[in-house]
Amino acid sequence: QKGTGIDNPLATLRFSVSQIGLHALLHDNSGKVHYIEPESKESDVYKVFDRGYYGTQKIGLDCFTESSSTLDLEEVSSKISNRAVTNDVNLFEDSKLRTFRLALSCTGEYANLFKGNGTEVQQKANVLAEMTKAINRVNEIYERDLGIRLVFVDNMDDVIYLDASTDPWGGEYNTKTAGTLDEVIGVNNYDIGHNFNTSDGGSAGCIGCVCKQASQSSSHKGRGYTGLPDATGDPFYIDYVCHEMGHQFGAYHTMNKCDRGNQFTGSEVEPGSGSSI
């Protein structure tokens, strides 16, 4: 759910309510984000905090997304200046919100962080509630900046795996995620596929591959994944999930720093770690 400020329409609220409590974020017109979350999993006490709560410690996640070609910024700029609409550059100026069906899977290791106790159905519901928190946060950015909304596909419980010893993944995520989603969810039943895990890394498996089937090739729509040992909060949702899904929607790396990996020549124009999706 989401809301807009009565006195300040530039202020926005987005929240979810589930069996794990209320989780909300408030975005004011100064750019600050405030959060409301339970103090702990079993607590009725809530805390209000901002992004500074997470500290400034750098989390070691590597983006392994690779580019098959470089980005020609002069060519893109020329097409935009000339108002040219082609198959590879589309100008969306119709103010429409576009919805994409997201098939989001997870490994047993990820599920173990959030499943808690109870029956299998209850444990999957707990994991899905955490996934909802994540995508709710991603949508806050994507709807505002890109006009994109992600909605979960039906039967997503079928790709929430609770046991690491029996889930489909064994260290390789791109191809296995795409194959699992195609088989379990159905290749025609989702537009973008992703996996949450606890690895120290992420990869979209492609750039600009949303809605593409491509017979399990490197441009398949379901090859994305993101993982952190502590896969929760904005350091995971925004810094990494938004980043990897951004590749799937066609974004290249923008950060320009000495130790950057997987350089996309022509697009690294922002200092340090960058600020764009």
Regions found by a protein language model. Give the residues of each.
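Residue-level detector of short, conserved catalytic/binding motifs and their immediate flanks
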Residues: L22, F100, I192, Y237-I238, ...
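Fold-level signature of zinc-dependent metallopeptidase catalytic domains
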Residues: E42-S218
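Short loop/turn segments at secondary-structure transitions that flank enzyme active sites
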Residues: P9, S30, G108, D200, ...
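Short, hydrophobic/proline-enriched secondary-structure or compact coil segments at domain edges
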Residues: G21-D28, D191-F196, G224-T226
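N-terminal prosegments of processed precursors
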Residues: Q1-D44, R51, Y173
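A general structural signal for short secondary-structure junctions and capping/turn motifs
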Residues: R14-V17, L25-L26, F92-D94, E183-V187, ...
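The catalytic-center signature of Zn2+-dependent metalloproteases
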Residues: V153-T175, Q216-I277
